[in-house]
A protein has these predicted regions:
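Generic marker of residues within folded, mature protein domains
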Residues: 1-3, 136, 146, 251
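Single conserved hydrophobic/aromatic residue that forms the stacking wall/gate
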Residues: 1-15
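Beta-strand-connecting loop/turn residues
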Residues: 9, 151-152, 264-269
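Sequence-pattern detector for short linear motifs
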Residues: 10-12, 25, 61, 328, ...
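Conserved, function-critical positions that sit in or immediately flank catalytic
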Residues: 185-387
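Tryptophan-rich substrate-binding surfaces of secreted polymer-degrading and adhesive proteins
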Residues: 14-224, 302-323, 342
Length: 387
């Protein structure tokens, strides 16, 4: 029993909250504000729709106004927040959205030396031993997607990585267009158009650090699960027979994948996907087994097969780009709510309250604005009048 308890403790220590679970939680959080049917009224939806409110509070001064205390995750802090709460405003489903890091496409003239920025390419296997060009050890930390000057978002499918340029090449041409096919620019980059951020969403959710993640239904419907878009020469090898080798099948659990290899000077100089196939969750190319390429004299060539996300590129942008954060945007308008928001008070605390009840009942609140002030407490030495 003691050994079992020890193993259980070790399992708890080693477990971690994965990014995929965080994305799932973010999606469920927003969906909870909508409920099973967004067309239902609050009365019909009842407890099936969460009521989330942003509150302001703490009208009294801190001991040091220029250095307020760091919030503490404790029951006492929780109680204090309720005690000094002033007003609340409801957060609707339309006020919340999943967001990802904002990564701008940068013109070469704005980069050091004017050479352009090297973006990471999408890979399914980043790790501490296989890092991105930026040094990232996992995909969601990599700079593998961009938003252009027209608020169009693209995923970098290939950045020029090769044995001679193991970290890829600078991007010098801004990706544009909304084609559902892979977009190749003259600098050798290959981009997948993901979606465009509408003006309204730009104004509401596009910040200096984050941007909304959305779905383009045309891109989503065109996505092919397990379709291979990219192969990368890991090692050129030597001693191979010069020529072009076509229709080379991909080994893996999918079907229909084919590539073409070009050998010059005994080394692999090009590897291109000619048919992406479908349903690949793993795949590989064994160069030395390609018919006629080596005849026993060539060796050392290696080609990586880049496995796409489940469902294909563009099928689930929140999962593909790492939408595990939620941005909430709601405005407190001057004196709104018929007095729910006093205009002559400062506030020093802001937070979220889930499913508050109407005062004196166990009925969920549903108003857009609420007053959270049930009483006013004066210090013993207070003098003056109160109306």
């Amino acid at each position: 029993p003691h050994d079992l308890a020890r193993r259980q403790r070790q399992m708890c220590i080693r477990d971690r909250l994965t990014d995929q679970f965080r994305i799932f939680t973010a999606e469920k959080f927003i969906k909870s504000l909508e409920g099973p049917d967004s067309t239902q009224s609050d009365i019909v939806a009842g407890a099936n729709r969460d009521r989330l409110y942003v509150f302001i509070g703490r009208p009294q001064e801190w001991d040091n106004e220029n250095n307020p205390p760091t919030p503490i995750d404790s029951f006492q802090e929780f109680s204090d927040s309720y005690d000094d709460m002033i007003s609340m405003k409801r957060v609707l489903a339309s006020d919340a959205i999943q967001v990802v890091r904002r990564i701008d496409w940068i013109p070469p003239e704005q980069t050091t030396g004017g050479l352009g920025y090297v973006y990471d390419m999408y890979r399914n296997d980043y790790s501490s031993s296989k890092t991105a060009s930026s040094g990232a050890t996992k995909l969601y930390d990599a700079d593998f997607y961009v938003v252009n000057s027209s608020y169009q978002v693209y995923k970098c499918i290939y950045n020029g990585t090769s044995p001679s340029d193991p970290n890829g090449k600078p991007s010098t041409i801004e990706p544009t267009g909304t084609s559902t096919s892979i977009i190749t620019t003259a600098d050798g980059y290959r981009w997948k158009y993901m979606y465009t951020i509408p003006v309204g969403q730009v104004l509401k959710f596009f910040s200096a650090d984050y941007m909304p993640v959305l779905i383009d239904t045309a891109v989503q419907s065109d996505a092919v699960g397990g379709e291979i878009d990219t192969v990368v020469i890991q090692s050129s090898g030597s001693g191979y027979n010069n020529g072009t080798y076509e229709n080379i099948p991909l080994r893996g659990d999918g079907t229909g994948g084919r590539i073409s290899i070009v050998v010059d000077g005994g080394r692999i100089v090009s590897a291109t996907v000619t048919s992406g196939g479908s349903n690949y969750s793993f795949g590989k190319i064994v160069v030395d087994e390609v018919n006629g390429i080596g005849s026993g004299t060539g060796s050392g060539g290696a080609i990586d097969v880049i496995i796409p996300p489940k469902g294909g590129h563009g099928s689930t942008p929140a999962i593909e780009l790492g939408g595990f954060r939620v941005m909430i945007n709601t405005k407190f308008t001057y004196s709104e709510g018929s007095g729910d928001f006093p205009t002559d008070n400062d506030y020093r605390r802001i937070g979220l309250v889930l499913n508050p009840f109407k005062y004196g009942t166990e009925e969920l609140a549903d108003a857009i604005t609420l007053s959270a002030s049930n009483a006013v407490i004066f210090s013993p030495d207070f003098t003056g009048s109160f109306n």
